[in-house]
Amino acid sequence: MGKIKKSRKRNTFNYNKNKKKLKKKLRRKEKPHIECPQIRKAWDEHKTVKQNLQDMGLAPGTKGMLPIKPKKNTKVEPMETNVLKPYVIEEMEAEASVRGNDRTTCSTDMIEYVQHMVKEHNEDYKAMARDEKNYYQDTPKQIKRKVELYKRCHPEQYAAFIASLQSQKST
């Protein structure tokens, strides 16, 4: 008993079609993914890119926005804009003004190294450079940068360390 014609043809490869070209064509036609959540929320599928950005009060590019050389005699007048969605700009400005936390940190080895150097030599970076614990032969400026990095990344820990040094010296 034979197989159905459709089931035999289903798994055959069509050599006449360029799959790479078809995939590129599909990717070009599909809608772009918008990273910014404010723009994505306010985007209208039925409008063009230029119309959407104009409604939001955004510029599609920098070309022609600002004059290269302002003329001396003419006054620069502000452009008239019909911003239909001003909340997009406000949300984007609010997000940009929020300061992100600094993710830089110090390794435990570097913290121990800096604490040893400060404990032995206080703020004398030249003496730190000559210290025998300076295995990597850091210059005074490199050591200073490491101490400043430690101060910036762990300010509470550094303050507690300095306070403990002061209490040890006073006793």
Curated annotation (Swiss-Prot):
**What keyword terms does UniProt attach to this protein?**
Nucleus
Q: Which domain of life is it from?
A: Eukaryota
Gene Ontology terms describing biological process: ribosomal large subunit biogenesis
Q: Where is the composition biased (Basic residues)?
A: 1-31
InterPro entries named among the record's database cross-references: Ribosome_biogenesis_Nop16
Location in the cell: Nucleus, Nucleolus
User: According to the UniProt record, where is the region Disordered?
Assistant: 1-34, 56-79
Q: Which cysteines are joined by disulfide bonds?
A: none
The yes or no answer to whether the keyword Ligase is present is no
Q: Which family does it belong to?
A: Belongs to the NOP16 family.
Read off the PANTHER family from this record.
HSPC111 PROTEIN-RELATED, NUCLEOLAR PROTEIN 16
Question: Protein name, please?
Answer: Nucleolar protein 16
Q: What is the lineage of its organism?
A: Eukaryota, Metazoa, Chordata, Craniata, Vertebrata
